[in-house]
Regions:
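Acidic-and-aromatic substrate-binding clefts and catalytic sites of carbohydrate-active enzymes
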Residues: 18-23, 41-53, 73-82, 111-115
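Short, Lys/Arg-rich amphipathic segments at extreme N-termini
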Residues: 9-19, 23-27
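Hydrophobic faces of well-ordered beta-strands that scaffold small-molecule active sites
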Residues: 7-15, 39-41, 63-70, 103-105
């Protein structure tokens, strides 16, 4: 197994893991300072910073985006299904604006008593 204790080139930091230590701009600066070359920011952190400002800070720090967290929750009840789909479309657009390699998805659990092949399972 590779020892990453002193070589951070292969690391990507999921920014939710350090959200209590600082805002997204602080996290970006700390990653650059410590040689971590990629991050995986969360949508709420980007929204709090502003997408244009976050994208510029990431670029200016020389960081890559290994992903963007998160889309998903496709199995919302019927009343929220359209809202969930619209939110996922926005997440895809945001990921593209940031230049993220991927959008991390959490598909969501199936509603109680649903069966394989039901509408919620097909949404996944």
């Amino acid at each position: 197994m590779r020892d990453l204790s002193s070589d951070h080139r292969w690391m990507s930091l999921n920014t939710a893991t350090v959200r209590k230590q600082g805002a997204l701009l602080d996290i970006i600066e700390a990653c650059a300072r410590h040689g971590i070359r990629a991050i995986d920011p969360w949508r709420d952190q980007v929204a709090a910073t502003g997408i244009d400002r976050a994208a510029k800070a990431i670029r200016d720090a020389g960081l890559a985006l290994s992903g963007y967290c998160r889309g998903g929750m496709f199995t919302a009840d019927a009343a929220r299904r359209i809202e969930a789909r619209d939110d996922n479309r926005r997440a895809v657009d945001e990921a593209k604006m940031l230049g993220a390699a991927c959008l991390v998805l959490v598909a969501g659990g199936l509603p109680q008593y649903s069966r394989p092949g039901s509408t919620p399972s097909k949404d996944i």
